[in-house]
Amino acid sequence: MAPDDFIEMIGNAAGKICADYNLPASVCIAQAALESGWGEYVIGNYNYFGRKWNRLGEYLELPTKEYIDGQFVTIQDKFQSYSSLDEAIEDWCVLMTEEPAYADALAEWESTWDVEAFIRAMAPVYATDPDYADKIISTINANNLMRFDGWND
């Protein structure tokens, strides 16, 4: 899917749902774009985020690349499956706001309202790729994704 088409598909839903959780939709959209290759590689149903199985609901077990001990390796892992795009976005929001592993990132966000600081605190928890934060930031900037952040209306 072309980036503009992907952004059109997810942008407004992410903007609305992320605003309900007081989170930056730009980060949500950029992560979905990166994890799914702009919608080309969706895992199961609506898993645009590459979200690992949370032990609730249905999952698919698939090979995935992870960065371990300084190199990318392929492992088998379980990935979440969703019934709708909105459910996937909401699950991302719940992950960011309720999962203890993201507490520092959430605290950084709530104290600074700095999207880049939030990304840099969140990225090492979310992904093993050491360049993940830079990739998210680049995707946001290249596609003007901050226009979907609720406080930029």
Which role does the model predict for each range below?
Residues 1-153:
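Catalytic cores of secreted/periplasmic lytic hydrolases that degrade extracellular macromolecules
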